[in-house]
């Protein structure tokens, strides 16, 4: 694989779009030229032949490749860089089908006060249905004190409801930090913008002498610019942070210089959610690959593509002349973690899979310094790190549920010890410890796989919710499963998107398993036998794992 440093023009990985398809001042022939030059994949000629920028972008069906007017582009930059704006306080992303999806909600904003949540979908604004070709930002924004009515499909229930919100000026806080419990450096990063790396460095320097653990909260971070890489400064030693592959097949890379200062050797715990996307996923994957910490939370959004913003400041003068305050944001790269893994569609799986309600509390139970006396403490060896947990704190009513779920989330590779006396550590299983402490513990592992040579692999997948068994807690490892059932199970577990293409001649388009088989094939998980998949052939559950 060839490597080159990433040129300045192509170094931006922006994700949020505040618009759908506004009327474009960009000439259609210029849109064609830019897409043919920079888009990550070859675009069918019938799409490029369409008669307007709006039609081309709509047919492309890429929610990340968008045109922004000057007003919309400025609003986008305000959101990324942390400015004060008038609105309802949400970051949104175009949906592939209908409406726009809320990715995060600002504290003390009208949206938060109304009870909206990340994952909710805005279907209409003041009775105007949001469809392709419409700009939701111009409908949502307005004067301070005026009202706007949103039709929302609630993520939690699927119910559609109207919410009337009063617009107000909201400041978009990119990074905030605080020393929690006297020894945890807590850094909340809601976006990657121009000031992010400087503020994070400030946090590391200010709290570094006291921090026994770093927590970086990316749960509301939908990405931003490529400062996800510069955010890494201070934790990482030199090395590649991300590979980005464009349509030319060359792998560009972003790296930390060998002379970059290392401000801390204290491990970092990254908090993730389904709304952590793009640069947030890039950072979480780099933390894992470079072994400087772990992640706790839920699987991330799964945006493994990066965008280039072409505007009047583009280094290519010919391109810059095409714009006057507006821009065209184009998907130009697929990005990969330093270990070669992609998060596209599948997301980044955290080290500990913890529910949203318990994520923060579980992380705050961990410490990196060994206590002077073992008695009353727990030692956890996980993913190459050793953490310590104060038992009385973990058993407190405020932390009991989070602690129980942390024990349930431990994979087979983790080792758990209970301290006694001055320096004695006795290994225990999470289930045994939970029983001694009277916790309401439910094992995610299977009760009938201990004799299988694949027991650890099976139980690891079970802990991360990637395979399921029977209601009685068994897996039946020697039973068989068809290839069609296997494909459908894994595609569902990974939440793979269904492609339009059919890959195998023996998989009918209307077969119940067709979506799963084609989704797996599109991601390259298997290729079948020539053009034949053999959906009815069987494998055992063990072989499946």
Predicted segments, located by residue:
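PDZ/PDZ-like domain micro-motif
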Residues: 107-121, 173-176, 543
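PDZ-domain C-terminal substructure recognizer with occasional recognition of PDZ-binding tails
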Residues: 101, 123-125, 136-176, 331-332
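Conserved PDZ fold ligand-binding element
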Residues: 111-132, 215-217
């Amino acid at each position: 694989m060839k490597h080159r440093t990433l040129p300045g023009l192509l170094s931006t990985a922006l994700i949020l779009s505040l618009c759908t398809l506004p009327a474009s001042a960009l000439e259609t022939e210029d849109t064609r030229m830019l897409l043919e030059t920079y888009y990550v994949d070859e675009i069918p000629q019938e799409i490029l032949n369409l008669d307007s920028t709006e039609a081309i972008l709509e047919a492309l069906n890429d929610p990340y490749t968008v045109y922004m007017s000057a007003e919309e582009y400025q609003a986008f930059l305000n959101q990324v860089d942390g400015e004060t704006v008038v609105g309802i306080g949400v970051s949104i992303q175009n949906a592939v089908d209908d409406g726009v999806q809320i990715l995060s909600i600002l504290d003390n904003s009208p949206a938060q006060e109304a009870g909206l949540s990340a994952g909710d979908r805005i279907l209409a604004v003041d009775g105007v249905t949001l469809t392709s070709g419409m700009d939701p930002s111009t409908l949502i924004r307005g004067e301070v004190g005026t009202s706007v009515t949103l039709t929302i499909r609630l993520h939690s229930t699927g119910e559609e409801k109207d919410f009337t919100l009063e617009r107000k000026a909201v400041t978009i806080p990119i990074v905030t930090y605080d020393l929690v419990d006297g020894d945890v450096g807590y850094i909340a990063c809601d976006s990657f913008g121009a000031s992010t790396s400087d503020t994070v460095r400030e946090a590391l320097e200010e709290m570094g002498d006291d921090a026994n653990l770093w927590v970086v909260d990316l749960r509301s971070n939908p990405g931003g610019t490529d400062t996800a890489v510069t955010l890494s400064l201070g934790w990482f030693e030199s090395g590649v942070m991300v590979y980005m592959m464009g349509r030319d097949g060359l792998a560009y890379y972003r790296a930390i210089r060998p002379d970059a200062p290392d401000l801390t050797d204290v491990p970092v715990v990254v908090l993730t959610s389904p709304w952590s996307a793009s640069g947030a996923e890039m950072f979480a994957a780099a933390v894992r690959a470079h072994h400087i910490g772990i992640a706790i939370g839920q699987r991330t959004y799964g945006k493994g593509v990066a965008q280039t913003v072409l505007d009047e400041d583009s280094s290519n003068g010919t391109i810059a002349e095409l714009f006057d305050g507006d821009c065209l944001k184009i998907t130009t790269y697929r990005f990969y973690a330093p270990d070669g893994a992609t998060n596209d569609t599948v997301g980044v799986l955290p080290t500990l899979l913890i529910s949203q309600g318990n994520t923060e509390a579980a992380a705050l139970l961990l410490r990196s310094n060994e206590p002077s006396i073992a008695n009353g403490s727990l030692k956890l060896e996980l993913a190459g790190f050793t953490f310590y947990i104060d038992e009385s704190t973990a058993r407190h009513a405020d932390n009991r549920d989070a602690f129980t779920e942390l024990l349930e989330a431990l994979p087979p590779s983790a080792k758990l010890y209970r301290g006694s006396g001055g320096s004695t550590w006795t290994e225990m299983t999470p289930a045994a410890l939970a029983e001694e402490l009277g916790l309401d513990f439910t094992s995610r592992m299977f009760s009938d796989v201990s004799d299988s040579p694949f027991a650890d692999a099976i139980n690891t997948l079970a802990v991360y919710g990637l395979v399921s068994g029977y209601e009685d807690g068994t897996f039946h490892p020697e039973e068989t499963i068809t290839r069609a059932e296997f494909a459908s199970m894994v595609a569902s577990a990974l939440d793979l998107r269904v492609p339009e293409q059919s890959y195998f001649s023996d998989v009918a388009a209307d077969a119940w398993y067709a979506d799963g088989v084609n989704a797996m094939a599109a991601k390259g998980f298997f290729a079948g036998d020539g053009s034949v998949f053999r959906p009815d052939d069987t494998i055992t559950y063990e072989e499946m794992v």
